UniProtKB/Swiss-Prot annotation:
It comes from Thermobifida fusca (strain YX). This is Small ribosomal subunit protein uS11. Keywords: Ribonucleoprotein, Ribosomal protein, RNA-binding, rRNA-binding. Belongs to the universal ribosomal protein uS11 family. The gene is rpsK. Residues 1-21 are annotated as: Disordered.
Length: 134
């Protein structure tokens, strides 16, 4: 049987047009396994994002503060190409890369206006999973 042609099977990838946003929001989601940094405009449309896995860390190294630092730097550099200079930071989750990611946003040249913790806390909602016994 002859191999099927892949013509038209792939998606067309085009570069996003350059936005001109001066003030944005940096959303840092830091879990026990990974850190994801998204930089959005004030309406919530994503300008740039990066995660520890996307930057090149795999497995348990994704959960380190250094991986969070590298992810925040990568997201900040891409956001600066779109004109972002100031950010308000929203941190979510209990992970180890929270403070490191905020510091690296400042180190790359973004001016941090405010920092808010938006970790969701249940008002006694769902029953949590049973405790791990190792």
């Amino acid at each position: 049987m002859p191999p099927k042609s892949r013509q038209g099977a792939g998606r067309k990838v085009r570069r996003k047009e350059k936005k001109n946003v001066v003030h944005g929001h940096a959303h840092i989601k830091s879990t026990f396994n990974n850190t994801i940094v998204s930089i959005t405009d004030p309406t919530g449309a994503v300008i740039s994002w990066a995660s520890a896995g996307q930057v090149g860390f795999k497995g348990s190294r994704k959960s380190t503060p250094f991986a969070a630092q590298m992810a925040a730097e990568a997201a900040a550099r891409r956001a600066q190409e779109h004109g972002v200079r100031k950010v308000d930071v929203f941190v979510k989750g209990p992970g180890s890369g929270r403070e490191t990611a905020i510091r690296s946003l400042q180190a790359t040249g973004l001016e941090v206006g405010s920092i808010q913790d938006v970790t969701p806390v249940p008002h006694n909602g769902c029953r949590p999973p049973k405790r791990r016994r190792v």
